[in-house]
Amino acid sequence: MMTNRELLINAARAGEIAGKYYIAYGERDVNEGIDIGGGRLWNPLINNADAFSLMVRLYLDLDVRDYGILVNSPDTGVRYKQLVARGEDREKATRLAIVNCAAIIGENL
């Protein structure tokens, strides 16, 4: 299992997102992502638009089921399944599945 840092760096590599990993600790939260300039952090783990863009950029197939999220990369053969328990945040699980699939692709580049 990869850390958030590894997930973000490898997913960015797969998606050809240029930037450096950045993390800052606040009083109540952690602000992390890939610094893509202009004061913007790219973080598909928490941002639906970033996750969707990554999915489209990598031509990933997404299959949402009641038990989990399946992400498949036809170009590379990489597949990832994120199980989802009843009542769990399905959008968060979907973002996590997309990022994990992309990170596996990026790790192998």
Provide a role label for each language-model segment:
Residues M1-L109:
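Glycine-rich anion-binding surface patch
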